[in-house]
Amino acid sequence: IHKSIVTTDEVRASGLLKDRIIITYPEEGTVNNDMAILQAAADDWKEKWEHWTQYCFEQHYAYVNPILIIQVLNGTGDALTDTNLDDCIIKIEERTGFKLESGQVVHTFGGTMATLTVNGLDVRYEEPSSIAEDRNIRVVFFKENLSTGWDCPRAETMMSFKHANDATYIAQLLGR
């Protein structure tokens, strides 16, 4: 066993630590606050996408393919989720200019491992531990299972439709 000293800059350069965490929420009274936050998240994700594309090209590195992670609401009644996933896909495509394709959007909803149809797009279930290795994945919808014990260095932007007050839960979610 050898002791290794690794600086924060080296870890950050590897992509395991993010340069910054930005927490944003619109002012009260803003129409559809959640979709405004999703718009901002999609804009941020696109900027990171462009940055990584340029950086990997310049450094002759394998392409990173950053992921947008979206925490959705639990469902009520028979609904799988109370978040309108169709609207989410539409908003992401509008803001980024990307036309998402089958295999690029996945879900980790433990209640169903079925493939969902969202805005005409097949959204398959993906085991959380497999997400980091699948370079085709761009967007992940989740409920709770990614909030603890999951790590994906490609996860560049996260947005949550859930309202949380518990400091421990918030810290765990941000730690992902």
Which role fits each region the language model picked out?
Residues 139-142, 146-164, 168-174:
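A short beta-strand element within the Helicase C-terminal
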Residues 49-148, 164:
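Conserved C-terminal RecA-like helicase domain
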Residues 29-32, 78-81, 150, 169:
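Extracytoplasmic/secreted cell-surface and envelope-processing proteins
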Residues 1-61, 65-67:
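Conserved P-loop NTPase catalytic core
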Residues 14, 18, 75, 174:
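Single, functionally critical "micro-switch" positions that shape active/binding sites
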Residues 17, 134, 151:
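A short catalytic or substrate-binding loop motif that flags glycine-/basic-rich loops and adjacent residues
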Residues 9-13, 97, 150-151, 162:
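Short, surface-exposed basic-aromatic patches at helix termini and helix-loop junctions that form
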Residues 7, 11, 36-44, 84-91, ...:
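Alpha-helical scaffold elements adjacent to nucleotide-binding pockets in ATP/GTP-utilizing enzyme cores
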